[in-house]
Curated annotation (Swiss-Prot):
Feedback inhibited by tryptophan. Heterotetramer consisting of two non-identical subunits: a beta subunit (TrpG) and a large alpha subunit (TrpE). This is Anthranilate synthase component 1. Binds 1 Mg(2+) ion per subunit. It is an enzyme of class 4 (lyase). The gene is trpE. SUPFAM superfamilies: ADC synthase. L-tryptophan binds at S29, P219, Y220, T221. Signal peptide: none annotated.
């Protein structure tokens, strides 16, 4: 297996050196139970690009009518290598909008993946940098490393301003009340409703990424500079597959951070004793169990963590972990299809919740609420939920957040939850509070 050891270099500088090439990406993932990065994957110049919207295209040419991105990718992954985690393969995003392949309706925001049979792999625990390649890459990895080692770190100036929102406080309170009516009538137990800020920015995408990682260290951080750029620091996996193990970590239940250690602990205690938050979390753990069970061996599904509190820069969340062993004939694409869309971004039951989201939200979700990550040539996969992120096109960015609505939700409180969730991303964009 072609794996070249290279002189170590700061991954941010290496990514910066690679930006002259097409469709660069940087994915950073943490070890289980830690937000400290374990591996960073960096590459560019995919061999081909898959776009799935109202059909599947490869490099701009329509190849099928398949609208489900996970099924489309499954049919295109022909190569396999021995190893673990990411060693080349598909990197990109599944747009939330592709739920219309499940519930009907037009897909307006395509899912996009590049196929990268070459990638830099940086191991944060050892400081080792290596370059995996199935074929000769369209760039010289050693020359890029040398260039990166000479790169000067610099802070970019610039900022952003909010230009509009699809739902201010009054409108969002109305949306939440309408969602609660569907809960009272028995359509759903919970529905996740979101709102968006549109922002004008003159900040470089890599600077936004650097600021966001510093402000909000998270298990998953990413920058993908495709035709659309996505930059994010997500706390939550939609699903991961390592070997034959399929894992979902549902996060549900949110409280703000305290200004002091004592206030923070009080808010954590209140969060864990809040009946509404507990009920919401248990509901979504059950949903994750069902998703994992759909593709796992009978009797292999288990709950390995329950009601842990994880703390981020502006919020703290309750998290659990559901694990199963993939059934015979099932692979990472089947696992992610079972998980998509994440129940923590729709509510339960999923299908009816998605229909209500379509009806009540004031604008389409685009990539937000979908997933960002990789499908490796090793058979492993890791997809973060596309939240705590900015979607950037030219000088315009959109930032979105949602809140889980249940029968006793207080609409005004849910509005402030969306504000708290967006705060770190807006701050990274340079929007003044």
């Amino acid at each position: 297996m072609p794996l070249k050891k290279l002189k170590p270099v700061d991954p941010l500088k290496l990514y910066s050196a690679l930006r002259d090439f097409g469709m660069p990406f940087m994915l950073r993932s943490a070890e289980k139970d830690s937000r400290k990065a374990r591996f960073t994957y960096i590459s560019a110049e995919p061999e081909f690009v898959v776009e799935v919207g109202e059909g599947t295209e490869i490099d701009g040419e329509r190849v099928s009518d398949e609208r489900n991105p996970l099924r489309a990718l499954k049919g295109l992954m022909g190569e396999r290598v021995e190893g673990r985690r990411f060693m080349g393969g598909f990197v990109g995003y599944v747009s939330y909008d592709s739920v219309h392949s499940i519930i009907g309706g037009k897909i307006e925001e395509p899912s996009v993946f590049g196929y990268y049979p070459w990638t830099f792999i940086y191991d944060h625990s050892t400081g080792a940098l290596s370059f995996f390649y199935l074929r000769e890459a369209p760039f010289d990895p050693e020359a890029l490393v040398e260039r990166a080692r000479r790169e000067e770190s610099r802070l970019e100036d610039g900022g952003s301003e909010v230009i509009s929102t699809d739902a201010g406080m009054e409108e969002f309170v109305e949306i939440v009340r309408a969602g609660k009516e569907y809960i009272y009538s028995g359509d759903v137990f919970q529905v996740v409703l979101s709102r968006e800020y549109r922002v004008r920015t003159d900040l470089d995408a890599l600077e936004i990424y650097k600021r966001l990682v510093e402000l909000n260290p998270s298990p998953y951080t990413f920058i993908l500079e495709f035709e659309k750029t996505v930059v994010g620091a997500s706390p939550e996996t939609m699903g991961s597959v390592e070997g034959r193990t399929f894992k979902i970590n549902p996060i549900a239940g949110t409280a703000p951070r305290g200004r002091t250690g004592e206030e923070d602990r009080e808010l954590e205690k209140a969060l864990l004793s809040d009946e509404k938050e507990r009920a919401e979390h248990v509901m979504l753990v059950d949903l994750a169990r069902n998703d994992v069970r759909r593709v796992s061996k009978p009797g292999s599904v288990r709950l390995t963590r329950f009601f842990d509190v994880l703390k981020y820069s502006h919020v703290q969340h309750i998290e659990s972990e559901v694990v199963g062993e993939l059934d015979e004939g099932k692979n990472a694409f089947d696992a992610m299809e079972a998980a998509f869309p994440a129940g923590t971004l729709t509510g339960a039951p999923k299908i009816r919740a998605m229909e209500i989201i379509d009806e009540l939200e004031r604008s389409r979700r685009k990539v937000y609420g979908g997933a960002v990550g990789y499908f490796s040539l090793t058979g492993d996969a890791d997809m973060a939920i596309a939240i705590r992120m900015a979607e950037i096109e030219g000088r315009k960015a959109s930032v979105r957040a949602g809140a889980g609505i249940v029968a006793d939700s207080v609409p005004e409180k849910e509005f402030f939850e969306t504000e708290n969730k967006m705060r770190a991303v807006l701050k990274a964009l340079g929007v003044r509070e």
